[in-house]
Amino acid sequence: HAGNRDAQESRGLGDVYKRQVIGRAGIGVDNVDIEAATANGTIVMNTPYGNSITTAEHTIALMMSLARNIPNANTSTHLGKWEKSKYTGTELYSKILGMIGCGNIGSIVADRARGLKMHIKVYDPYLTEERAREIAVEKVDLDELLQISDFITLHVPLTKTTKEIINSSSIKKMKEGVKIINYARGGLVNEKDLAKALKSGKVSGAAFDVFSEEPAKNNILFGLEKMVVTPHLGASTEEAQENVAIQVAEQMSNYLSNGAITNALNIPSISAEDAPKLKPYIKLCEQIGKLAGQITETSIKNIKIEFGGQVALLNTKPLISVLVAGLLSHSMEAVNVVNAPVIAKNRNMNITSSIREKAGDYITDISLTVETERRTRNVIGTLYGNQPRIVEVMNTRIEAELGPNMLFITNEDKPGFIGSLGSILADAKINIATFHLGRTKVGGDAIALIEIDEAVSTELIKTLNNIPQVKSVKPLNFAKNII
């Protein structure tokens, strides 16, 4: 069954879910109950790259409309006015385009903008220098991008990190008269803050294809003269609709004829025989990957995986996908166990894996090492019974079970740290569920993995960072499963 139009509820898909595969012609799957499909053993596929060119072209179209005041000039001329001086525009030639994020669609936008002779600056912590050179863009930090850009486009998923990445604070850092284009996700921009900036002239124009609430009917940005809006048309061209339809049909045909799985959203490639053996390791790999991903801050170059002891005797390919999906899940919106290796490859992340049948300190262990442009992070985990256990982080021995909300702290192994930490959390009425410590040597570097009953605020993180012995504090979240 393939489709891309009407939203459907799980109760209306009973017959469909008895089939082997559901195909979605496009990227969005809000019209498919993936949980119900998974429960019924049905693979859900989509076509995330079939409309990339169309969406990128829409971004360029919005930017050009904004630069030359085309929508307002069109309306004015239809009304019989002839306001040439009022709608004087600006050239794109030699202007600085600041791109926040540079994935698949972003790289196409960069290519088109380069053809317009724009200077392209990119903020993307996960874009390697090698990939930046390949697509001919210059990496900069976010503050620099905000300060120097004439046009700013958004190319990131909506996550906790990117939500309202454009707000009053970031707008203050921008050039006077900057123009902002958002085709990516509603919620990336604080719309009230943008409205104020448009009225004041700080932002001389904005063009949006997406909004915080859709369908958007009473948005605060509507009616503003300097605002160009379209109703989520990014993927709406005849060519894109045809491309995604052909792609999803080919994917489904390949699966039904020879078992090939492409762009599946809800299931790794695991045989019925392997499934019960791999089940506890899948959970362990998800936790290892998520932990490594949340303590890795810059663009990843190399991902090294080692399976030791009992796990080395199993089919480890699905486990590699789970590890990479967990690693990338905190920074990317649509990562799953099937597409994670492809996403990593597209971002020039080199994945290597090895097997060591001989047991080491544990009868079974999985090691994940992540190399970035600045540092290396490692996480090792094992199973106690069938329960996941983290046994090493950043080359420091520790034994920890992971809960939904955690704190990861690096500190100096000196007296007073635990007492200060406990007092601050107690004052904030944050209860500690478990507390795990590890250190390299007496008085040396130490780490702590602390499970707490609820997420902590940014203000509390700042307070914890002020403890004299503390080097860094990171809130971790393991509540949402990727499988």
What feature does the model see in each segment?
Residues 95-96, 119, 302:
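Residues that mark the start of a beta-strand
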Residues 125-220:
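Rossmann-like adenosine-cofactor binding region
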Residues 1-17:
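Single conserved hydrophobic/aromatic residue that forms the stacking wall/gate
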Residues 25-26, 41-53, 124, 142-143, ...:
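Short beta->alpha connector loops at strand-helix junctions that form conserved
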Residues 44-45, 121, 177-295, 312, ...:
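Rossmann-like dinucleotide-binding domain for NAD(H)/NADP(H)
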Residues 40-42, 48-96, 100, 104, ...:
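Phosphate-binding beta-alpha-beta segment of Rossmann-like dinucleotide-binding domains, i.e.
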